[in-house]
From Swiss-Prot:
The lineage of its organism: Eukaryota, Metazoa, Chordata, Craniata, Vertebrata. The active site is at 89 (charge relay system), 137 (charge relay system), 242 (charge relay system). GO terms for cellular component: extracellular space. This is Serine protease 45. Belongs to the peptidase S1 family. InterPro entries: Peptidase_S1_PA, Peptidase_S1_PA_chymotrypsin, Peptidase_S1A, Ser/Thr_Proteases_Immune/Dev, Trypsin_dom, TRYPSIN_HIS. Glycans are attached at residues 110, 162, 186. Residues 49-290 form the Peptidase S1 domain. It is found in: Secreted. One of its GO terms (biological process) is proteolysis.
Amino acid sequence: MAASLSRLSAGLAASRPLGLSRSFLLLVLLLLNSGYKGDSTKPACGQPWWPKNLDLSRHWPWEVSLRVGNEHVCGGALIDLKWVVTAAHCIQGTKEYSVILGTSKLKPPNSTRTLLIPVRDIIMHPKYWGRTFIMGDVALLQLYNPVIISKYVQPICLPEPNYSLKVGTKCWVTGWGQVKQRFSANSTLASELQEAEVFIMDNKKCDQIYRKKSHIPRVVPLVLGDMICATNYREDLCSGDSGGPLACEVEGRWILAGVLSWEKACAKVRNPGVYTRITKYSRWIKKQISNGILSVPCTSAWLLLLFWLLQPQMGP
């Protein structure tokens, strides 16, 4: 690095007699800074490629396995080339996380379609209260490298903040947890990605279900406004899928309605899943993504160039 900086410095010094004023070069640099926004091409979201016979094969290209080492800890959903949404309670301490995309297998074989990308940065929502009383249970993961879009890796759409899903809307929940009908205390995670058809439930009814065995006073709601419930009363997914997507098809596009936040007594079929309602956080998510895009690569070379341009003119 020192050698390259020396060469750059020498090159800059040699270029001074060319007559290019510092003011002009500084203006060019500022224009580049204001105009460059990284890769401006955005992949189409929420439009997965599926075979005609969905009974034989269905894949969810935004599905993410969040990992610590080789261990799957939570699910997540790809929403942009370098951004994943998951539940905030999935993040613990200062562990080094990575994500796997492009596969339905918990332990994928070596394949060109499977992506393993380290997590560069984690942004927790400021209203997250913690694992005891969950609120603001959403986190953003910024990846070190952008994903390579294929039919196996595609982002899901973020819903507009004012969009409201009607009670009874059909959605899908996916993850590597066991389905409730096959749940047991000794269950391990499923080797293949599981899916379950669910329906949006009224928050008040959802709150009543969970309140029956709760000692919390009735004046304190368990299911808050930033949560959304879904179930089909027959089959749902169990623990191991926290942070996983609740995906709903709306006008031909799939949107991320929620990420799995919590549920109680997985073996009891009538207990719905409670998800973080993404519409409540769409603006925050978009703001973080826009703030996270560096307008210019902040390298030593750029800093040295800027420093050189701002130096007082030496000589005649």
